[in-house]
Amino acid sequence: MTKKICIAIDGPAAAGKSTVAKIVAKKLRFVYIDTGAMYRAVTYIAQKNNLAYEDETAIAQLLQKTVIRFEPGEVQQVFINDENVTEVIRSLEVTNHVSIVAAHPAIREALQERQQIFATEGGIVMDGRDIGTAVLPNAELKIFLLASVEERAERRFKENVAKGFAGDLNQLKKEIEERDHLDYTREHSPLKKAEDAIEVDTTSMSIEEVANKILSLAEQKINN
C-alpha cells in the first residue's frame, strides 16, 4: 500500500505550480488541492456581491456562509455552494485582484483551516504561496518552484492565447511583478521558501521534467 504523504508545492504566480501538482497527484493517485482556486473563488464572490476587494470584514463574513468544494474532472471542477465557477474564477478581473483579497489575514486564516482539514488523511498534493510554511508545515515533501519573470509572463501569455484571450506580453510582465511584490511583502503568511523545502528553478525545464523531478523526490519519501 502506498504511504500517504503530504506534498506542498509553493512558488510565485505562473511558476507552473498547478500544472505540475496535477500531474504529480495523478501519477501518485493522490488528491490535488488547488488553494489558488480557493482564493480566486473568494475574490469572485466579492466581485459578484459588489464588495470592495479591500473590505476584509465584509468578505470574511460572506466566506463564513460559503461552501467551496472541488470535484474531479479532466479539469478539476470548482464549486461555490452549487455554482460551478471553474471558468469564471480564471477571469482577468479575478486574476488582477486575487492578491488583494489573499492578503487579508481573516481570509487566509479561514481558508488555511479548510485546507488543513483537506489534508488530515494524507495522500494529497497542495499548491499555493504558503503551504510549506503556514498550511502544512509538517508536510513530508516541500517544493519551492521558481522561474524568471520573463519565463512566467511567456507561460501566462501562451495560456491566455490558448483560452482565446488577447494579451500584451509586457503588460503581463508588469502584472506578474506587481503580484510578486504583493505576495512577498504581505504581512500575513507572505510567499517564502520553507527552510526544509527543495528549490526547483523551472526556467529552462519542461513541465514533464519538473513533474518527474518531484515524483522522484516523492517516491524517495514514500519508500523511506
From Swiss-Prot:
Any one GO BP annotation for this protein: pyrimidine nucleotide metabolic process
InterPro entries attached to this UniProt entry: Cytidylate_kin, Cytidylate_kinase_dom, P-loop_NTPase
Molecular functions per Gene Ontology: ATP binding; CMP kinase activity; dCMP kinase activity
Binding site for ATP: 11-19
Residue intervals passing through the bilayer: none
An example Gene Ontology CC term for this record: cytosol
Main location: cytoplasm
E.C. no: 2.7.4.25
Record localization: Cytoplasm
Pfam families per record: Cytidylate_kin (PF02224)
Catalytic activity: CMP + ATP = CDP + ADP; dCMP + ATP = dCDP + ADP
Keywords: ATP-binding, Cytoplasm, Kinase, Nucleotide-binding, Transferase
EC category name: transferase
NCBIfam families, A to Z: cmk
Record-stated family: Belongs to the cytidylate kinase family. Type 1 subfamily.
Protein's recorded name: Cytidylate kinase
Gene: cmk
